[in-house]
Design a protein with these regions (language model features):
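Short, charged/polar connector segments at secondary-structure boundaries
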Residues: 1-116, 126, 171-184, 214-276
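A short, basic-hydrophobic beta/loop patch
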Residues: 97-113, 119-151
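Extracytoplasmic "Venus flytrap"
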Residues: 293-313, 318, 331-337, 425-429
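Flexible loop/hinge segments that line or gate small-molecule binding clefts
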Residues: 371-394
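Hydrophobic alpha-helical segments within soluble ligand-binding/sensing domains
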Residues: 393-415, 505-525
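Segments of small-molecule ligand-sensing domains
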Residues: 522-638
């Protein structure tokens, strides 16, 4: 019997060997000694006896035995060899009494390499053992900025508090989100009961997930587990979920899992879509314009928040433009979590066809509700999300900020210009850099001092600017109704009273009108294709963003700005075309290439004439952390 099973294991090994070879991959076990020869190691840590997930044991420590095993740890030596005899004896012992002696191995970058016990691992994997007991030594590499290295150090922080090694995530920030969804603080030390409870949930989820997706599901189980928890967080009362409930919830989100498996393909619509052409039968059968009921869900109120004030102006404009055809309702001061869920459910109960959630913080709740209610159109005000069940919308500001930079550069006399930014989120870096490029185009020696209002107060920043003779400052572009201020847009702060020179205008009314028109004219249904997430990112050419230049700006400078604005709106110029330089060197050298919308939105570098950096996570205020958690650029340091 053991000989027959060895031959089965041998065939599995030969198939694995052949597959790896045909794919141009190394067809034997990985050797840790060889990997470490190219790695800076800073420490070793004894982890003691651990339960190691079998799938995470990928190699051997030394090169001596590597050719005896295929990459799946199945044997490659013929069944007459001494190796085969020892393997069969170990196999018989396992069937009779089990393998009790732990292997000795090293853990490096979340993978395990065997020092003693290769045949034990081979037998246990052949028998389908989900885990192997091992005495583990962790090898810790030098910390770097490489994404894989940063992700590993995030895992180390997670392991330090949880002692959990079977959850291996692939995205930066994932472990922080996981802890949040499990209901744990980042520095909370897990108890044995905590570990048992999470393990139980994970095992139940894994069973349901693999029943649906097979033994090789669309994405790794750990990543799917995190996606599941993001939509269905743990019950704070620790009520155990039944497999039937997990299955029902998993089926609702399956399209989102498939989308992630494809690499989260998304499409950014930079211009409103035209209505699809209709033939005679379409006109004859058309029921006419549909009456729409639309909900706006805000996290603050328009009296205290410039952001919400702008959206409320857009909502009122919408009702005015579609009298008798559109009804809107507004929800203010809605908190994340249960209150948001109740609010969205209430909007759906009131027969809303469209729901706008006006902050990136509501993205997760929007997705959760959209999955449960596919007939309702839910849009979140954020940029470049990768979810098929909802769509996102945002104003494209960087082109207008470039024009503001032109004015700042032209008027700057001492080479010092200030820039106040708020959230280090996707799209914001492009605004900063476009402004800096505008400055450089007309004043190559000027520099921009970058400051963050979510780290320091606006008043403190302005005082520092004045003390350092930074007289021209790009301030935030919105005004709070209850706290009006002239510090918006490009401002000259040299005198006692601020002098406004330019302003970038968010025209939310135009944006909402065009979004509603895409629903009414059929462009919504014709846009995009199955399996692609859609994001609306409209700017000056769509009338969603406007740029105002004060008469105080010299006439020739205004003419230059008007010319460049026309070129941008006609598609004849992009601030991010040709050679581009960051603080670290050249970003793009091709004179004939422009950055794509995706590259602009996900920009991670600052222009070479910017003095400053992205803020440290711990320096951000709590409001900013909540936004950055969802839409932040991924090189914000912990």
């Amino acid at each position: 019997m053991a000989r027959d099973d060895y031959q089965k294991a041998l065939k599995k090994g030969e198939r694995s060997y052949a597959r790896y070879l045909s794919e141009g991959k190394y067809p034997y076990l990985q050797v840790l000694e060889e990997l470490l020869s190219h790695t800076d190691v800073v420490a070793e840590e004894d982890l003691g006896i651990c339960s190691i997930p079998s799938e995470m044991i990928v190699g051997t420590f030394t090169a001596g035995r590597r050719t005896a095993f295929a990459p799946n740890f199945m044997p490659l030596l013929d069944d007459e060899s001494e190796f085969a005899a020892k393997w069969q004896a170990l196999y018989n012992a396992h069937l009779e009494e089990g393998i009790h002696d732990p292997i000795k191995c090293y853990e490096f970058m979340n993978r395990y390499y065997v020092l003693e016990g290769n045949k034990r691992v081979s037998v246990l994997k052949f028998c389908g053992a989900p885990s192997v007991q091992g005495n583990v030594t962790r090898i810790i590499p030098k910390r770097t900025d490489e994404p894989e290295n940063r992700l590993y150090f995030e895992f180390l922080a997670f392991y330090k508090c949880s002692k959990v090694n079977y959850i291996v995530l692939s995205k930066l920030g994932g472990y922080r989100t996981l802890l949040e969804k499990l209901g744990f603080d980042a520095d909370y030390k897990w108890t044995d009961d905590d570990r048992m409870e999470v393990r139980s949930l994970y095992v139940r989820f894994e069973k349901v997930y693999k029943e649906k997706g097979g033994e090789q599901p669309p994405i790794p189980t750990s990543d799917a587990f995190l996606m599941y928890l993001e939509l269905y967080p743990c019950d704070p009362n620790h009520e155990e979920k039944l497999p039937s409930q997990i299955k029902s919830e998993l089926l609702k989100m399956w399209d989102e899992i498939l989308l992630q498996a494809k690499g989260n393909p998304s499409e950014i619509k930079t211009e409103p879509q035209e209505a699809p052409k209709k033939n005679l039968f379409d006109y004859l059968l058309s029921p006419g314009t549909k009456y729409l009921k639309i909900a706006f869900v805000h996290d603050k109120n328009p009296q205290d928040s410039a952001w919400i004030y702008g959206h409320e102006l857009g909502r009122m404009y919408l009702e005015e433009q579609f009298k008798g055809k559109v009804e809107t309702i507004s929800y203010n001061d809605v908190s994340q979590g249960a209150e948001l869920d109740r609010t969205l459910d209430d909007a759906i109960a009131k027969k809303c066809n469209i729901i706008f959630t006006t902050t990136p913080q509501f993205l997760e709740g929007s997705i959760k509700t959209a999955i449960k209610n596919p007939s309702v159109k839910i849009l979140n005000c954020s940029v470049d999300t990768n979810h098929q069940c909802i769509r996102t919308y945002y104003a494209r500001l960087f082109e207008a900020k470039f024009l503001s930079g032109l004015v700042a550069g032209a008027l700057c006399k001492n080479g010092k210009i200030g820039y106040m930014a708020d959230y280090p989120i996707c799209g914001m870096i492009a605004n900063i850099n476009a402004f800096a490029i505008g400055v450089k185009m007309v004043n190559p020696n000027a520099t921009i001092q970058l400051e963050w209002t979510t780290v320091r107060s606006k008043q403190e920043i302005l005082e520092d600017f004045k003390a350092n003779e930074v007289n021209l400052v790009s301030c935030l572009e919105m005004i709070v109704p209850n706290s009006p201020s002239r510090y918006f847009g490009l401002v000259n702060i040299e005198k006692d009273e601020p002098e406004n020179l330019t302003a970038v205008i968010w025209n939310w009314g135009a944006l909402y009108k065009k979004l509603v028109e895409t629903v009414q004219n059929g462009a919504w249904d014709s846009a995009g294709s199955d399996g692609v997430a859609l994001n609306y990112w409209w700017g000056m050419s769509a009338g969603v963003v406007d740029f105002i230049c004060s008469p105080k700006v010299p006439v020739k400078t205004r003419q230059l700005v008007e010319f460049m604005q026309h070129q941008i709106m006609e598609g004849g110029f992009s601030p991010f075309s040709g050679e581009l330089y960051s603080q670290d060197g050249i970003v793009q050298s091709d004179d004939n290439r422009s950055l794509t919308p995706e590259e602009i939105i996900n920009m991670r570098w600052l222009a070479d004439n910017v003095n400053g950096s992205l803020p440290h996570w711990n320096k951000l205020n709590e409001d900013a952390k909540a936004v950055v958690e969802v839409q932040g650029v991924d090189n914000i340091e912990e």
